[in-house]
Amino acid sequence: MKVMISQPMAGKTDEEIVETREKAKAELEELGYEFINTLFTDEWYSKEAMAERGVVQVPLCYLAKSLENMSKCHAVYFCKGWKSARGCRIEHDAAVAYGLAVLYED
């Protein structure tokens, strides 16, 4: 079964984001889940590449890609603080509406 991680990122350092993600990934893999990466760091998502493509709502672009990846998943794992992050709340609504298993960080 495939799972993605939804986590708040605003106001966090890259290191904090990766640390939280790696911890969650290890827990999920221990439970037998296959991890689908939703941390988009390749060149396609650089500020310059998005500007070239005409992206004006960068957070919405990331959310759209996350929702696309959600379509490949059976479950979504929500990290602490998700209720305070607009994108996480939208991902949660989509996961519930489409019947994915919803998991929460303790």
Residue ranges and their predicted role:
Residues M1-D106:
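Conserved catalytic or regulatory cores that recognize and/or transform ribose-phosphate-containing ligands
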